[in-house]
């Protein structure tokens, strides 16, 4: 099977980029497959090694010489010409869009081979509307942009693949071409947590969406009862200075530590005893699965979408209503005070994480591709 992934870049350290590489590598290992990753911008080496994959850089370079709206549409026209030419040379069976800049173009291309066109949604459908808006103009712009995406461009795909049943049920009612496929675990760590260290951990970009300000306030409540425990927050981002100031003003220096960026996320997780998530929204919450894969129990806000899919409340962790900092702190304290419960939940999560192994997810994708290609062929032959 000839499979093409189209995305913005594989040189940027981001979740979509890592997941795309990991899936493409796994599919390329399956006998009979030939896999391409086609990018618009490749200014440096891929963030993960590519194993048996054709990498094609179209050289559009949206982000290196971007000159406003006029320049963007000029780049889009260039992108369309190059992408159409390449795909007609490859003649793929399946084309998957995972990025942003190609999503508008694929349904418009003239492709005589009629490949299966799939759009992967790595964010919950209305994620842009969930961000805090500063003006009515921004609200209107985001609404119009969303309508354009989902009522015109997205309908040009054969199938849309979302990450959770929750997203499908809440946001895609009436769409009969929407399917669900979770992301795989993208790294493996042989060392598992003992759940004995007096450390809780959170990982993510220091941005509004992750709401680490809420987590710091929660930890202020936790440390009143358990001053010997500490919280490590791993990641970098635009809110770092503001969060450091919040920590200082709350008297939590040494209790809450902004650790910076690490490429060894699972290793850091394995040295902790709890994983905490206070995001306002997630596309999937892959970080929760990664935490489970090293045996950590979870406490998470029940934000859209992902935590409800991953966490079975009371079994491998706890779900808390978004913004309920008091209950969140109580759940954390409950796990701190009950080591056997921590370990029991950690083991339950470890077992649950096995269904997200990349080998299993790759086989599920292959079966999905085969089924959808057969269905498309049947429809074509019946005309």
Summary of predicted features, one role per range:
Residues 5-13, 26-73:
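N-terminal strand-loop element at the rim of the active site
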Residues 17-22, 198, 205-221, 238-244:
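A conserved mid-protein helix/loop that constitutes part of the nucleotide-sugar donor-binding site
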Residues 84-85, 139-159, 173:
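Membrane-proximal helix-turn-helix segments that form the acceptor-binding/catalytic region
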Residues 97-103, 121:
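Short His-centered aromatic/hydrophobic patch
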Residues 166, 184:
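Carbohydrate-associated surface elements
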Residues 261, 280:
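Aromatic "clamp/platform" in nucleotide-sugar-dependent glycosyltransferases that forms part
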Residues 297-301:
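Short hydrophobic beta-strand element within catalytic cores of glycosyltransferases
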Residues 312-314, 318-325, 333-340, 354:
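Conserved acidic donor-binding segment of nucleotide-sugar-dependent glycosyltransferases
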């Amino acid at each position: 099977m000839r499979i093409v992934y189209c995305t913005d870049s594989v040189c940027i350290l981001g979740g979509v980029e890592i997941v795309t590489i990991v899936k493409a590598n796994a599919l390329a290992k399956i006998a009979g497959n030939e896999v391409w990753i086609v990018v618009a911008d490749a200014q440096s080496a891929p963030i993960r090694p590519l194993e048996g994959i054709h990498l094609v850089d179209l050289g559009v370079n949206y982000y290196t010489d971007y000159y406003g709206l006029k320049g963007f549409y000029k780049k889009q026209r260039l992108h369309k010409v190059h992408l159409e030419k390449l795909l007609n040379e490859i003649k793929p069976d399946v084309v998957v869009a995972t990025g942003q800049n190609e999503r508008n173009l694929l349904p418009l291309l003239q492709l005589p081979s009629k490949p299966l066109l799939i759009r992967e949604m790595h964010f919950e459908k209305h994620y842009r509307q969930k961000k805090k808006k500063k003006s009515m103009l921004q609200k209107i712009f985001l609404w119009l942009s969303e309508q354009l995406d989902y009522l015109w461009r997205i309908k040009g795909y054969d199938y849309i693949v979302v990450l959770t049943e929750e997203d499908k049920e809440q946001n895609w009612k009436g769409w009969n071409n929407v399917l669900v496929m979770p992301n795989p675990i993208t790294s493996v760590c042989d060392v598992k947590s003992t759940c004995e260290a007096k450390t809780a951990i959170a990982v993510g970009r220091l941005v509004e969406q992750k709401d680490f300000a809420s987590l710091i306030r929660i930890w202020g409540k936790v440390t009143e009862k358990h001053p010997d425990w500490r919280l490590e927050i791993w990641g970098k981002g635009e809110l770092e200075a503001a969060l450091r100031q919040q920590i200082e003003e709350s008297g939590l220096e040494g209790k809450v530590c902004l650790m910076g960026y690490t490429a060894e996320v699972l290793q850091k997780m394995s040295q902790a005893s709890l994983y905490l998530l206070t995001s306002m929204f997630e596309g999937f919450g892959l970080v929760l699965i990664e935490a489970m894969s090293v045996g950590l129990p979870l406490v998470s806000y029940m934000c859209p979408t992902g935590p409800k899919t991953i966490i079975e409340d009371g079994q491998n962790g706890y779900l808390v209503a978004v913004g309920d900092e008091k209950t969140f702190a109580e759940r954390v304290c409950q796990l701190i005070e009950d080591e056997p419960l921590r370990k029991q939940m950690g083991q339950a999560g470890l077992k649950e994480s096995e269904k997200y192994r990349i080998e299993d997810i790759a086989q599920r994708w292959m079966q999905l591709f085969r089924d959808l290609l057969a269905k498309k062929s049947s429809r074509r032959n019946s005309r």
